[in-house]
Design a protein with these regions (language model features):
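Conserved lysine of the Walker
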Residues: 14
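Hydrophobic anchor at the beta1->P-loop junction of P-loop NTPases
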Residues: 4-6
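P-loop (Walker A) phosphate-binding loop of NTP-binding proteins
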Residues: 9
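Hydrophobic positions on the alpha1 helix immediately C-terminal to the Walker A/P-loop
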Residues: 17
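Active-site signature of alpha/beta-hydrolase-fold catalytic machinery across serine-
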Residues: 20
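ATP-dependent NMP and nucleoside kinases share a basic, alpha-helical "lid"
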Residues: 92-176
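N-terminal phosphate/diphosphate-binding loop that engages ATP/GTP or pyrophosphate donors
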Residues: 23-96
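Small-molecule kinase domains that catalyze NTP-dependent phosphoryl transfer to phosphate-bearing small molecules
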Residues: 67, 76-78, 121, 125, ...
Length: 203
């Protein structure tokens, strides 16, 4: 099995590049950013307060752990039809809402939550080595934060995508106008948030 790990800052084109590669080679596609968004959606759905400067990290961690260990979560790895489900409900569009976008960092910045997600991501990657997996054992393209440095530092292919800030901001704004649900987020603000919990270059 070939593992391709693609990392980089917000708005650089990780998703479109990753899906194109997976489609070309017949690999599975794993959007780890969507997994973090799904966790934020789940916490909000469970009535957890994610507003304000202080959040209950233990409550968030317990909710996320239940989300994954309680068989509530699933992710589709078909690059043509990637999906996220919670208790059988397709929430692929719901996790791209402005409400989720504005709260996802409150969940993703909780270190124990990241540990849960990293373990889950590694499990999904390992699953593709099986002959009866989506890729029939060929491989997987995984994209998102920590992929090249923490989740799969030993991947056969590791890619760091970069682009100028103004280019990334233009892409984000264009996605918002096109209705992609990313809300035209400020990539500079996202960079600052990411820098607190992830390093693209340190393996």
């Amino acid at each position: 099995m070939i593992r391709v790990a693609i990392d980089g800052p917000a708005g650089v084109g990780k998703s479109s590049t990753s899906k194109a590669l997976a489609r070309h080679f017949g690999f599975a596609y794993l959007d780890t950013g969507a997994m973090y968004r799904a966790c934020a959606w789940w916490c909000l759905h469970q009535g957890i307060d994610l507003d304000g400067d202080q959040v209950d990290e233990q409550q968030i961690t317990e909710a996320v752990a239940e989300f994954f260990t309680g068989d509530h979560f699933d992710i589709g790895v078909d690059p043509d039809h990637p999906s996220i489900t919670a208790d059988g409900e397709d929430i692929s569009e719901a996790i791209r809402s402005s409400e989720v976008s504005s709260h996802v960092s409150k969940v993703s910045n909780v270190i124990p939550v990241r540990h849960v997600l990293i373990a889950a991501q590694r499990a999904y990657i390992a699953r593709e080595s099986a002959a009866d997996s989506f890729s029939l054992g060929r491989g997987i393209v995984a994209e998102g934060r920590d992929i090249t440095t923490i989740v799969a530092p030993d991947a056969e292919v590791r890619v760091l995508l970069t682009a100028r800030e103004e280019v990334r901001q233009a892409r984000r704004t264009g996605q918002a106008v096109a209705g992609a649900g990313v809300g035209g987020e400020d990539v500079a603000a996202r960079d600052r948030a990411d820098s607190k919990v992830t390093s693209f270059l340190t393996a």
